[in-house]
């Protein structure tokens, strides 16, 4: 059932959008779901999974990642600075770098563990007070700090656009921002807007309910 849902999404992207040159990676957002629900996807060969709480993910994924070394774990939630050590231990990607303080903590922890995670800067694309993320005006300076001073491996940008009728415009804006700072990856698009996101350059889609169903 879950495998069928994943394949339906892939087929829909293939049929409705010209993605002959690239295929966006689908991150199956497995947060709050038990491993018995997730395991069929892993055994099927799906590799990318998203979690939003470091310690919960550690309990759930530590052994699985040893058993299935091809699995890539994506931190998609807000990271508390006192949880950075767990994130660096377990995860392969961070999609939610949103402050200088967090960037510094990640840099320190990576040096301790001799690791280099692939990182997205979270952009507050709608300039919303209630959301985290780097403002458009600060993005260039923040990117330079992360890459030059802290030596972080910034591969792209991530956004959570406002829930309004301008979602496509935000996706277009994100693509333009990525081109300006010369990063290739865009983490944008979820269960309700992944087709629009793909049309406008998303390379990573974060899809939860469309694969796993609604959470309890």
Q: Which functions belong to the PLM regions below?
A:
Residues 1-185, 190-192, 198-200:
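Conserved alpha/beta-domain cores
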Residues 198, 211-216:
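Expand to "…catalyze enediolate/carbanion chemistry for C-C bond making/breaking, isomerization
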Residues 203-204:
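Divalent-metal-activated hydrolytic enzyme cores
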